[in-house]
Amino acid sequence: MSRFILLAALGYICSQAPALAQVTPFAGALGGVATLSADARSLPTSHGLNVSLYKPANGPTLNFIAGVHLNQYLSVQASYGWNRNDLTLSSSSSGSNSFYVEQRSSSQRAVLFDLLVYFRKRDERLRPYLSVGTGVVHFASTRQNQIALNGTPTLPQTRFSSTQPALRVAVGIDVAVTHRLALRYSFGETVRHNDISAQLSPPGERILANFQNLVGFVVRF
């Protein structure tokens, strides 16, 4: 439903573009909290039950943006984002009495391009928006501490990483402080291939979702 509304709004705004065109560049910086999705899987076997899971902790995130307001309602932006999250991975096999628990660090670096659709004109003090974008995200994780180990479980690699395409959707609002300066709040979700789940044994099946609560400032030029 939200996608339909976004597409309908975009179609209307694009039809009005010639009358509204007035390109204005902007840039900004935002920071906040990143929350990763978790995953778990259980797999029955002839010898018992194999279980694996990972639990992420909330971590810091930074986002730097630059773009242009194409008209009163439509903007495009490029962004570079970083976030760090600690992880706890574990796996157990009742048949072989093997298990492990380990702590890991993880980080993501993203380059994304977004289309923003505003619902109020540029001279309004409150300007809510929806956005959708795509790009690439580099994920990396390193083992920090082996908490428990018994038997011969299949362990994740000491370090693993990959660069994958990603999709991001977000909602937010710009609150004008001055004519050129605005406070921006944004809540977004970025999804990509899940390298963490792929390292579990048995492997998890969920995609990796990165939820970000961001607040910062945007300056018009």
Q: Predicted segment positions?
A:
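Flexible, solvent-exposed coil segments and beta strand-coil junctions
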Residues: R41-H47, L87-S98, Q146-T154, V191-S197
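Residue-level recognition of beta-strand termini and adjacent short loop/turns
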Residues: N71, A176-T178
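Gram-negative (and chloroplast) outer-membrane scaffold detector with strong preference
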Residues: Q22-F26, G31-S37, I65-L149, L208-F221
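Surface-exposed strand-loop-strand hairpins of Gram-negative outer-membrane beta-barrel proteins
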Residues: A34-L62, S162
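Short sequence motifs at beta-strands and strand-loop junctions characteristic
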Residues: Y54-P60, S105-A110, R159-A166, E205-A209
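Cleavable N-terminal export/targeting peptides
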Residues: M1-V23
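Extracellular loop and loop/strand-boundary signature of outer-membrane beta-barrel proteins
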Residues: H47-L53, S96-R104, T152-R159, Q199-E205
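Predominantly the C-terminal beta-signal and adjacent terminal strand-loop region
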Residues: N85-L89, T178-F221
